[in-house]
Amino acid sequence: MTITMLKSKIHRATVTEANLNYVGSITIDKYLMDKANILEYEKVQIVDIDNGNRFETYVIAGEKHSDVICLNGAAARMVQKGDKIIIMSYCSLTIDEANKFNPTVLFVDNKNNIEKLTNYEKHGEII
């Protein structure tokens, strides 16, 4: 048996663009992807902190160090430029694997620069 666990998270990223006329996906700065352990074409869940929308899409790599967070295609209707979002990916692990696993959690500032990189979250605290 496997369970689904949080693998990677980019917390409070700022949407820099919303491109309705693109095929689909979310474009994420390749540097942020690498630091957060998110792969190109990986399925992610997006939570918009400003409006409460939750949806899934896949990732495409943006230019490294561009700080881009761009929702493309239909997903562009779910956000506004400037919204704060949480980007999460998940993995399937056995119970034994899950008990030893820690996700990669990336906290970013208003310009999508990394403030903190950790493998642990505690309720009410930024570790």
UniProtKB/Swiss-Prot annotation:
The active site is at S25 (schiff-base intermediate with substrate), Y58 (proton donor). Keywords: Autocatalytic cleavage, Cytoplasm, Decarboxylase, Lyase, Pantothenate biosynthesis, Pyruvate, Schiff base, Zymogen. It catalyses: L-aspartate + H(+) = beta-alanine + CO2. GO terms for molecular function: aspartate 1-decarboxylase activity. Pfam families: Asp_decarbox. Pathway: Cofactor biosynthesis; (R)-pantothenate biosynthesis; beta-alanine from L-aspartate: step 1/1. Its main location: cytoplasm. It is found in: Cytoplasm. Binds 1 pyruvoyl group covalently per subunit. Its cofactor is pyruvate. The modification Pyruvic acid (Ser) is found at S25. Is synthesized initially as an inactive proenzyme, which is activated by self-cleavage at a specific serine bond to produce a beta-subunit with a hydroxyl group at its C-terminus and an alpha-subunit with a pyruvoyl group at its N-terminus. Gene3D superfamilies: 2.40.40.20. Substrate binds at T57, G73, A74, A75. Its EC number is 4.1.1.11. One of its GO terms (cellular component) is cytosol. GO terms for biological process: alanine biosynthetic process; pantothenate biosynthetic process. It is an enzyme of class 4 (lyase). SUPFAM superfamilies: ADC-like. NCBIfam families: panD (TIGR00223). Catalyzes the pyruvoyl-dependent decarboxylation of aspartate to produce beta-alanine. HAMAP family: PanD. Belongs to the PanD family. Heterooctamer of four alpha and four beta subunits. This is Aspartate 1-decarboxylase. It comes from Clostridium botulinum (strain ATCC 19397 / Type A).
